[in-house]
């Protein structure tokens, strides 16, 4: 299952530093077993794991934005495109992140 490793409230930290920042939070999460399989294929991918999801208020757009790097981009970035097992894993990770964002967006309506 998924594990939440950290929640970083950048706007609270900005306020503590005497600065202003619209609501901005980053969630760091993942499944250690899945991440380990990716790192076994190329340990350098550890730089990008666990996954991160940024949630912030964009005043210009007038809405809340959810932003993340697609796990499938990691396969290309770390030369894992030829690993069929990795492709299956990152496809599932892409779908998971899309599902999370869809669920959050639907809950906000």
Label for each model-derived stretch:
Residues 1-109:
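Feature detects long, helix-prone N-terminal segments enriched in hydrophobes
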């Amino acid at each position: 299952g998924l594990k939440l490793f950290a929640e970083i409230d950048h706007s609270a930290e900005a306020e503590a530093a005497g600065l202003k920042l619209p609501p901005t939070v980053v969630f760091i999460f993942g499944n250690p077993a899945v991440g380990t399989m990716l790192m076994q294929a190329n340990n350098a991918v550890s730089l990008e794991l666990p996954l991160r999801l940024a949630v912030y208020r964009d005043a210009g757009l007038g809405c809340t934005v959810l932003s993340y790097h697609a796990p499938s981009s990691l396969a290309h970035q770390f030369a894992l495109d030829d690993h069929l097992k990795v492709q299956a894993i990152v496809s599932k990770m892409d779908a998971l992140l899309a599902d999370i964002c869809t669920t959050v967006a639907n809950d906000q309506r």
